[in-house]
């Protein structure tokens, strides 16, 4: 049995966020459970802060801020994760 990966995309609804959402959805594998989280929700903003999100868009995988989000913008190569069926 394959363990699901919890992928969270923190978004403010901006064009860059929409591009990031499309990228994550395109790269997501069959074992990925993708959630789009609205930073306008105070609980989402608190979760983002707890994870160390400093700007949006940002992606967390299994509760860890993805390395693709530590610079300026999301980089596809850094976001790639090993695909599992």
UniProtKB/Swiss-Prot annotation:
Query: Which key words are in the record?
Result: Plasmid
Q: Which InterPro entries match?
A: Thioredoxin-like_fold, Thioredoxin-like_sf
* Family matches, as Pfam families: Thioredoxin_3
Q: Which domain of life is it from?
A: Bacteria
Q: What is the designated name of this protein?
A: Uncharacterized 9.0 kDa protein in mobE 3'region
């Amino acid at each position: 049995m394959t363990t699901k990966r919890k992928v969270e995309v923190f978004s403010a609804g901006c064009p860059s966020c929409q591009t990031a959402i499309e990228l994550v959805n395109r790269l997501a594998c069959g074992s990925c459970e993708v959630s789009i989280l609205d930073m306008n929700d105070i609980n989402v903003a608190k979760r983002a802060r707890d994870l160390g999100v400093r700007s949006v868009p940002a992606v967390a995988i299994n509760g860890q801020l993805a390395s693709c989000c530590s610079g300026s913008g999301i980089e596809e190569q850094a976001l790639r994760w090993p695909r599992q069926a």
